[in-house]
A protein has these predicted regions:
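Helix-turn-helix DNA-binding module
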Residues: 123, 127, 131, 135, ...
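Amphipathic, Lys/Arg- and hydrophobic-enriched alpha-helical face
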Residues: 25-43, 60, 122, 167, ...
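Short, charged helix-capping/linker segments at alpha-helix termini
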Residues: 2, 14-23, 33-52, 154, ...
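Sigma70-family region 2
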Residues: 14-15, 40-41, 52-69, 88-90
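Arg/Lys-rich amphipathic alpha helix in sigma70-family domain 2
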Residues: 59-66, 76-96, 111, 174
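Internal acidic/polar
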Residues: 2-6, 91-115, 142
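Structural recognition of an alpha-helix C-terminal capping motif at a helix-to-coil junction
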Residues: 34, 48-55, 59, 68-80
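Short, Lys/Arg-enriched C-terminal cap helix and immediately downstream tail that follows
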Residues: 87-90, 125, 130, 165-177
Length: 177
């Protein structure tokens, strides 16, 4: 197994090495898919967003600043693509409210059910808050990285994150969590 660093693989990619691209895809695909699926809630759309992220990586590899994390750069590209898709959807579709799930005993719930409830709560957030929440809380990006990914100021990121956290907490309280 090749243990080349992301920086080394990016240097190879800039030279046209398709094997380097395959290694980068293998290394980062799962994280990007989790991000895209969490934001879009649709497997096909998430797959498309990840595919477009790697196409942009291939086409624009020279724009990558090797002093920064490649994972963060890829998350930024993917999140922007998802954000564009969410804006497109908002223009074309009405928001569908989800039915709340009543939880009698949260201690008896399986981890998968808790995750499903969290995802359900996050899915009800407006697109900006959802993107900020996912990038910051789930993907672990720093506020300045989220700001760069979403074209917001760090203050806007913090404000959106505060509202998103409050909303998610309130939704989870309704489930008894």
């Amino acid at each position: 197994m090749n243990s080349a660093t992301d920086i080394e693989l990016m240097q190879q990619l800039r030279g046209g090495n398709e094997a380097a691209l395959r290694q980068l895809i293998e290394r980062h695909r799962e994280r990007l898919y989790r991000l895209a699926y969490g934001l879009l809630g649709d497997r096909d759309a998430a797959g498309d967003a990840v595919q477009e992220t790697f196409i942009r990586l291939w086409r624009h590899s020279r724009r990558y600043d090797s002093s920064k994390s490649l994972a963060t750069w890829l998350c930024t590209i993917c999140a922007r693509r998802c954000y564009d898709e969410l804006r497109r959807r908002r223009r074309h579709y009405a928001t569908v409210a989800t039915m709340p799930v009543e939880v009698v005993n949260p201690d008896a719930m399986a981890t998968d059910e808790l995750i499903a409830l969290l995802n359900q709560a996050v899915a009800t957030l407006p697109p900006k808050q959802r993107v900020v929440y996912r990038l910051r809380e789930i993907e672990g990006l720093a506020s300045d990285e989220v700001a760069a990914a979403t074209h917001m100021t760090t203050d806007q990121v913090k404000a959106n994150l505060f509202v998103a956290r409050t909303t998610v907490r309130e939704k989870l309280k309704k489930y008894g969590i």
